[in-house]
Amino acid sequence: MVLIRVLANLLILQLSYAQKSSELVIGGDECNIDEHRFLVALYHSRSKTFLCGGTLLNEEWVLTAAHCNRVFMYIRLGMHNKNVKFDDEQIRYAKEKYFFRCHNNFTRWDKDIMLIRLNKPVSYSEHIAPLSLPFSPPSVGSVCRAMGWGQTTSPQETLPDVPHCANINLLDYEVCRTAHPQFRLPATSRTLCAGVLEGGIDTCNRDSGGPLICNGQFQGIVFWGPDPCAQPDKPGLYTKVFDHLDWIQSIIAGEKTVNCPP
């Protein structure tokens, strides 16, 4: 299952590498209808084009990747098949958007994260429920679950109507530094490295912003990966949710001064 990441013009200007526009899971299977109640879909309001995934944190907040941002966008919650609407599906708009502006000990690779406050609270239902933030850091070697409506083939673009899910492995960050020398990744980072080194399973375009769930905890946000997707020895990068907890929680709490992680 290939998760596809959505390219954002803002990050194209800021970053010297190419991101996937939205990533889809390659080498996976259709997600069980009950396993992604927290998974949301971001759409462009004018073109009605599917952009990215995201994760519902509570009745009012969604966490996704910053490069998924568009001026005009809406969020579908409780969706499985894009073309078949559940009775409890809900649509919301972004009331507020928050971007990570902290500079201390954070590089440009560590900031692809965005909090969206919805225009009105969501009602939990059979197909809509939140995903909790992690309570402990991720461990290298963990088996992680990736999911999204991104491409299922690469480089040919095949977009599914239903979300696909796949298991990938959480790898040592140094594996990604070695795999992608052209990007000169910093020696230390608050991003996660994950994939299947044998190839064939990966996130891909239009899965950006979706969750990476490791040992049952929400540990990563789909961020960047090689193109074509699912190449051997070419794992992808994921924003590390645990290292952004202070920032996330201070914004949701409505604090006037945002807490930057140490």
UniProtKB/Swiss-Prot annotation:
InterPro entries: Peptidase_S1_PA, Peptidase_S1_PA_chymotrypsin, Peptidase_S1A, Trypsin_dom, TRYPSIN_HIS
Glycosylation (residues): N105
SS bond list: C31-C165, C52-C68, C144-C214, C176-C193, C204-C229
Pfam families: Trypsin
Subcellular locations according to the entry: Secreted
Matches recorded under PROSITE patterns: TRYPSIN_DOM, TRYPSIN_HIS
Keyword check for rRNA-binding: no
Summary of the tissues where the protein is detected: Expressed by the venom gland.
Prosequence residues removed at maturation: 19-24
Main location: secreted
N-terminal signal peptide: 1-18
A GO CC term attached to the entry: secretory granule
MF GO annotations: serine-type endopeptidase activity; toxin activity
PANTHER family xref list: KALLIKREIN-1, KALLIKREIN-RELATED
Family designation: Belongs to the peptidase S1 family. Snake venom subfamily.
Protein name as it appears in the record: Snake venom serine proteinase 9
Naturally occurring in which organism (per UniProt): Crotalus adamanteus (Eastern diamondback rattlesnake)
